């Protein structure tokens, strides 16, 4: 909104020209979301306490988690709220990717809110039946897949050459490719157009990431810390993908409107940092499914929009491992005579059962997350 208001006035005041820069507005989005959470979280936490919106802890989980019973949950409300306000202020509101990201965040947060509310109301950990959560996630995934397959025309492959006469890089080939194309990390010349199959693929990405973050949200600061790390990597990827010169130099697809996605990612980072202040061990508040389902979903959507879907496996490796641990545990239990691969799933509980303290698990997973995020960014040069 600020861009639409102030940038047209740049000739009246030179400072308004700053609003044209993605980096300036991204920094503004980070700061705004961070400040909003820091300012309003204490009041929201007190309100949640008065409403008795406390965490319901599974009785089959680690015994050390029983002390968390009653800790205010649904803190994702002020994460989502601060992101929405920050994006409203700093992003170009006529950018369709921003609109879809915002709508997706709202829809998935509604699903998460219903899940949290039912857990609190009935004082158990069941919440919204899984089929309904999958419905919300699938609905969002299909919308994103349909948009990218049928309507999005923003993906280009560009080749530049040095003009020896003037010593300047010039575009010699600009080729539009379908947004249903997936690009392989480490290989600049290998890409596959999934065509109509991109819709179920996009749906799978959204559903998987939404559930992966949800499953990871079991220790103080774990899910939100990893989200900050992953969002920082996505900010780099979205910025370079939206810059034609950098994208061409790195031999990655140029997404003509991806730069604006960086502003949205900035809001994620700011809100995440603010929430971590209150969610660090011992947590004063939990994000609940209103936060984890929605934030995980938009991480997947961002990767789809900037055409780095497959890099999710690398930069989101901890989330992927957490989700896979649950899938493998259930599969092994059902089909191999009730045998368990892990002491407890998700994976963070396995390490708790192995004697690691909660803070050890969290910080060691952070370290792995940082390493994998750096590897993901490094793939930009290994092509």
From Swiss-Prot:
It catalyses: UDP-N-acetyl-alpha-D-muramoyl-L-alanyl-gamma-D-glutamyl-meso-2,6-diaminopimeloyl-D-alanyl-D-alanine + di-trans,octa-cis-undecaprenyl phosphate = di-trans,octa-cis-undecaprenyl diphospho-N-acetyl-alpha-D-muramoyl-L-alanyl-D-glutamyl-meso-2,6-diaminopimeloyl-D-alanyl-D-alanine + UMP. One of its GO terms (molecular function) is UDP-N-acetylmuramoyl-L-alanyl-D-glutamyl-meso-2,6-diaminopimelyl-D-alanyl-D-alanine:undecaprenyl-phosphate transferase activity. Its cofactor is Mg(2+). Pathway: Cell wall biogenesis; peptidoglycan biosynthesis. GO terms for biological process: cell division; cell wall organization; peptidoglycan biosynthetic process; regulation of cell shape. The chain crosses the membrane at residues 26-46, 73-93, 98-118, 131-151, 182-202, 221-241, 258-278, 283-305, 360-380. The keyword Cell division applies. Its EC number is 2.7.8.13. The keyword Electron transport does not apply. Catalyzes the initial step of the lipid cycle reactions in the biosynthesis of the cell wall peptidoglycan: transfers peptidoglycan precursor phospho-MurNAc-pentapeptide from UDP-MurNAc-pentapeptide onto the lipid carrier undecaprenyl phosphate, yielding undecaprenyl-pyrophosphoryl-MurNAc-pentapeptide, known as lipid I. This is Phospho-N-acetylmuramoyl-pentapeptide-transferase. The gene is mraY.
């Amino acid at each position: 909104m600020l861009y639409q208001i102030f940038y047209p006035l740049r000739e009246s005041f030179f400072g308004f020209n700053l609003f044209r820069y993605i980096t300036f507005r991204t920094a503004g989005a980070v700061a705004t979301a961070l400040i909003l959470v820091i300012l309003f979280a204490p009041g929201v936490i007190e309100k949640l306490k008065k409403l008795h919106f406390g965490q319901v802890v599974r009785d089959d989980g680690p015994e050390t988690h029983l002390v968390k019973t009653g800790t205010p949950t649904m803190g994702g409300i002020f994460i989502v709220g601060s992101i929405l306000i920050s994006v409203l202020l700093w992003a170009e509101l006529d950018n369709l990717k921003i609109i879809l990201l915002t709508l997706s965040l709202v829809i998935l947060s509604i699903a998460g809110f219903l899940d949290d509310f039912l857990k609190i109301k009935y004082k158990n950990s069941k919440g919204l039946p899984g089929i309904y959560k999958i419905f919300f996630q699938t609905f969002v995934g299909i919308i994103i897949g349909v948009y990218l397959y049928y309507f999005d025309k923003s993906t280009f492959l560009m080749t530049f050459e040095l003009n020896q006469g003037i010593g300047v890089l010039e575009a010699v080939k600009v080729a539009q490719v379908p947004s249903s194309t997936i690009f392989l990390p480490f290989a600049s010349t290998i890409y596959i157009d999934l065509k109509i199959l991109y819709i179920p693929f996009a749906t799978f990405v959204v559903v998987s990431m939404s559930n992966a973050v949800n499953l990871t949200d079991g220790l103080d600061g774990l899910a939100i810390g990893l989200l900050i790390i992953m969002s920082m990597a996505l900010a780099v990827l979205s910025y370079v993908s939206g810059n034609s010169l950098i994208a061409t130099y790195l031999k990655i697809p140029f997404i003509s409107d991806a730069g604006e996605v960086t502003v949205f990612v900035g809001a994620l980072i700011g809100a995440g940092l603010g929430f971590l202040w209150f969610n660090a061990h011992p947590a004063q508040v939990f994000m609940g499914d209103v936060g984890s389902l929605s934030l995980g979903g938009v991480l997947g959507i961002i990767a789809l929009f900037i055409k780095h879907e497959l890099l999710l496996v690398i930069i989101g490796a901890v989330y992927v491992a957490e989700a896979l641990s649950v899938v493998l545990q259930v599969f092994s239990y059902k089909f191999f005579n009730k045998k368990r691969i892990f002491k407890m799933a998700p994976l963070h509980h396995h390490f708790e059962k192995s004697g690691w303290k909660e803070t050890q698990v969290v910080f060691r997973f952070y370290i792995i997350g940082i390493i994998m995020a750096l590897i993901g960014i490094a793939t930009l040069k290994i092509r």
